[in-house]
Amino acid sequence: MAAKDVKFGNDARVKMLNGVNILADAVKVTLGPKGRNVVLDKSFGAPTITKDGVSVAREIELEDKFENMGAQMVKEVASKANDAAGDGTTTATVLAQAIVNEGLKAVAAGMNPMDLKRGIDKAVNSVVAELKNLSKPCETSKEIEQVGTISANSDSIVGQLIAQAMEKVGKEGVITVEDGTGLEDELDVVEGMQFDRGYLSPYFINKPETATVELDNPFILLVDKKISNIRELLPVLEGVAKAGKPLLIIAEDVEGEALATLVVNTMRGIVKVAAVKAPGFGDRRKAMLQDIAILTAGTVISEEIGMELEKATLEDLGQAKRIVINKDNTTIIDGIGDEAQIQGRVAQIRQQIEESTSDYDKEKLQERVAKLAGGVAVIKVGAATEVEMKEKKARVEDALHATRAAVEEGIVAGGGVALIRAAGRVVGLQGENEEQNVGIKLALRAMEAPLRQIVANAGEEASVIASAVKNGEGNFGYNAGTEQYGDMIAMGILDPTKVTRSALQFAASVAGLMITTECMVTELPKDDKADLGAAGMGGMGGMGGMM
């Protein structure tokens, strides 16, 4: 086991504080409408330019191991805020730095760290409760646009795109962010259910100009096994041909003789058919086939429940208004499924989301909800260079997370005002002893830190503006973008309540642990030169033996 370096008391805390300040100072330059960019060197390719706090935090690794421990703990604050609300990482870092700096001063003055922490926790819990009281629901498209604009660093085009996307696919819908091909940002909305499986043969194409298969008012056959024998399909094909409608087959696979016969029949115009593979794998495939069945009022032909493909009738087939298939995707538009059954299925999947512990599973279940409930919107980010594309894409993703958080828990006045107002409402809070009171006071004082940093980044005098905002009431605050005082909500400067709450809770949690630190242990650095020297000498000895 490697030897350890151990530091105690003030020595440990000073080192830890240095690390906290180095990381927080790098992150906090990005805060606010006039925040600056940070350039991150990469081991290959062009450097990354970002205004995203968590991206900056993740890059920082310090040489001094004790300082690095402090930096890593604040990095944890930014990461947790990002995971919980998708935004507010810089605010969380600024709050953590303010609480740690104030707290360690009190510890150095001889205060009991545990009582300080209890006081901080008490203040934070009270402020969180007040934030909930100050919060108002985020319902209109205009409010969603404003939240998106603020989170995308005052880029109103991004705010508009997110508001349009939410309007089209609903607040529960899936909105994804992808690299665009041009200079302009675009919004693509896929209505209906789309899954990532294309046609099994290009001979099914009936719209050569777009290389797609389009079926109007088709029947849909859902089978959860491979189909290779055409005899199994004949009864269904005959029934569909008599009805004079096209047919889409969704199965685990269609191969060999079955696929060849379908292609020949389609080319001769005997029956209009297309075949695609079922989406997903294993249990997820079965679940998605069932989703499609409910959406189209069909039945999955499954041998597990004793159904045979040869005995399938037209009653077992689903129906939709239209189906479009290209080489990569199949889109089912306007399935004829019963609305009550679809909503029941959505509720069932939502229950699974609540119970799931895996982020990947949650994401896939959320996609299934969106496909059943309305559709999928894709925001394609346009930029002139790859460096700009990366930076812009990160901002759009931040804005998307922030708007989701706003819809979930509501909005409060932005620009650091909500924290100051919430702190002002609990100014009379008392602890059980004087040291807890000091903890409460320093936590409430730290609530000003985000506003002060926004103002400092705008090149203004933080103390003057913080004092003016504190003396104001309601949503009165300072718009650093226009350098004007006024009603923050009327000016469109909003923060999601969830983002502000998460930032404060995670900052206080980690800061409280750092204030109560008394000892730090790390490995002593290895002396690589000495090791190499010893190895070299050994080699020389071997040579001597040979002679």
UniProtKB/Swiss-Prot annotation:
GO terms for biological process: protein refolding. InterPro entries: Chaperonin_Cpn60_CS (IPR018370), Cpn60/GroEL (IPR001844), Cpn60/GroEL/TCP-1 (IPR002423), GroEL-like_apical_dom_sf (IPR027409), GROEL-like_equatorial_sf (IPR027413), TCP-1-like_intermed_sf (IPR027410). Keywords: ATP-binding, Chaperone, Cytoplasm, Isomerase, Nucleotide-binding. GO terms for cellular component: cytoplasm. PANTHER family: 60 KDA HEAT SHOCK PROTEIN, MITOCHONDRIAL. ATP binds at residues 30-33, 51, 87-91, 415, 495. Forms a cylinder of 14 subunits composed of two heptameric rings stacked back-to-back. Interacts with the co-chaperonin GroES. Its EC number is 5.6.1.7. It comes from Aggregatibacter actinomycetemcomitans. One of its GO terms (molecular function) is ATP-dependent protein folding chaperone. Belongs to the chaperonin (HSP60) family. This is Chaperonin GroEL. The gene is groEL. It catalyses: ATP + H2O + a folded polypeptide = ADP + phosphate + an unfolded polypeptide. Together with its co-chaperonin GroES, plays an essential role in assisting protein folding. The GroEL-GroES system forms a nano-cage that allows encapsulation of the non-native substrate proteins and provides a physical environment optimized to promote and accelerate protein folding. It is found in: Cytoplasm.
